[in-house]
Amino acid sequence: ACTKQAVTKMYDLAKEGLVLAHEQMDFMLAVISNMKKRDWVEVGGKQVPLPKTLGYHNQGYMAAHPMYASTNLDENPGWDPERWTDVRPWDWYMGEGEVSLADPSYPIGGTSPVGTKVNPQMEACTGVPLYDGAPVEVGPRARLVTFKKFDEKGTWGQHIARQLEYTDCLYSIINALDEYNPDGKVVADYIPQGDGSLGWAANEAPRGTDVHLAKVKDGRVLYYEMLVPTTWNFPTCSRALTGAPWQVAEMVVRGYDPCVSCATHMIVIDEDRKVIAQKFIQ
């Protein structure tokens, strides 16, 4: 539990942060408004058309709570495991192909050369979670669409929603600190040993709905799966790229704030913690 002094300090910091959040929101909304009016952007020294429908898709939205929390223990939870299914990437994405267009002037270092082999079926690194049989978008816009009737579409709609959440987040922190009771009962006051049935929790994180599923029996984990926001968003992001000039594809992808590694440093150690192999993968 936190001391009263710690709660007071966090409260003061949250109040300071609220002022900064309003400044950040106003500044970024002005920047986004300017971008929405543009007909083109410059990429690699070339003018590229900027569609008004950049990042549009016709998929649904999913959110379990209006802010960074959950409704798992409510009578009517905001997420239902019966509505979720998983599809393997090799059953979802296209098979082998090759790059047919290249631009050496594209930042940074140019694009992949013509003829480069690709195979999304085998190279995709995540499964494809579906809700009610279809891909969904999760994240700031999904929360505002679900709970506040937000209707801004496309890439700019995602950025606008993210800015609007800044202040809501700080207000939520302040309200939580006002209600905090260090002597209150904890939600999980014991460690369940489990009977092998499925347990789950769907919590809203900044990037979107974060679902964890587990089966535990006699204190041992039998099954564990994480459906993190980026995993939900990848299939929808792919569809949002349809029709966009390839030079601005990165703008669409970044609208989802994907949690993906730019590079992976793999290290293999033995029982004596001696490094026996390592590889840097980009």
Residue ranges: model-predicted function:
Residues 210-228:
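Short beta-strand elements
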